[in-house]
């Protein structure tokens, strides 16, 4: 797999893949309900991150909010102007062991 032009997977693609997986297991669930579950899942992730909770999915990874220190000498890449960046919070993802091992095996 080349990392220069990687295929992009959208939420609709994921919904289609989950729908196919469900049908392959002889179950029926309309795509609109799959989309509702995915939307609710992401809303819960956002809500918990905004509450400064750590979200852990064993073997997949952990989501958390971290504080990033500000800098005095950051540069605006469009104008080249030096700007001051204040301390701020960022969402951070730390991959779990299984995900690390699976991604490590990707051929580039």
UniProtKB/Swiss-Prot annotation:
CDD domains: IHF_B. The keyword DNA-binding applies. GO terms for cellular component: cytosol. The keyword DNA-binding applies. GO terms for biological process: chromosome condensation. GO terms for molecular function: DNA binding; structural constituent of chromatin. Disulfide bonds: none annotated. PROSITE patterns: HISTONE_LIKE. It comes from the Bacteria. InterPro entries: Hist_DNA-bd, Histone-like_DNA-bd_CS, IHF-like_DNA-bd_dom_sf. It holds the Pfam family Bac_DNA_binding. Belongs to the bacterial histone-like protein family. This is DNA-binding protein HBbu. It comes from Borrelia andersonii (Borreliella andersonii).
């Amino acid at each position: 797999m080349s990392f220069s032009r990687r295929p992009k997977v959208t939420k609709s693609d994921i919904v289609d893949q989950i729908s196919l997986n469900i049908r392959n297991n002889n179950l029926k669930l309309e795509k609109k309900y799959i989309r509702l579950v995915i939307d609710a899942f992401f809303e819960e992730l956002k809500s918990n991150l905004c509450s400064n909770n750590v979200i852990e999915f064993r073997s997949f990874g952990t989501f958390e909010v971290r504080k990033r220190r500000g800098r005095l000498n950051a540069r605006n890449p469009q104008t080249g102007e030096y700007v001051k960046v204040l301390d701020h919070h960022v969402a951070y993802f730390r991959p779990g062991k299984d995900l690390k091992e699976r991604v490590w095996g990707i051929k580039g």
